[in-house]
Amino acid sequence: AKAATWVAHAKAYADAYALPTKELGRGVPEQMLMMNVGRPEGAFESQFAGYPAIVYSYEYVDVYVVNGMIEGWNQKKSIKENLAETAIASYAKAYELDPKSESKVAAGVLNLANALAIQADALNNMGKVAEAAAAFELAFRAQQVVPAIKADPNNLYNAGMLTTMHAATLQGEEALAAFNKGEKIFAD
């Protein structure tokens, strides 16, 4: 297959990854949520970072609104498993086949890395530390696909720190495995 085919494949997977949350952003007014995403399937009261929140429930995501502003979200399900990982691998294959495709690959991996970092931040704000760490690590890995892109070390630092924080909540072999993973991330 040609590099362009791999870029198209990667873009489809990256777009599918971002789709459930692409209209969301912290600090966006509740009214914009309703205009951009539509009416939720339901709503209920909850807490977000210690504050009272209204949670608007959609098929793929719960959106947390505090004082009329989106503060976070929890993606309940994905369109398909491993979308981001598949997109990263496809972009890498495209670049491997044709290094001249660098500008298209770079644009795609940067968009994906940004979506992953935003999702990681949302997960961290929800207290989902392990999932946030994984998303930050994927954001960093996406940025490494094209050598011309300077991968953001903050993503790797966040991944390592959150992995270590998660490990501190575990016991026995699980804790050891998580600490080792955090150490490996920091070694990169």
Predicted regions and their residues:
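Conserved alpha-helical positions within TPR/SEL1-like repeat arrays
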Residues: 157-161
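Short coil/linker segments at helix-helix boundaries
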Residues: 12-130, 138, 143-153, 166-178, ...
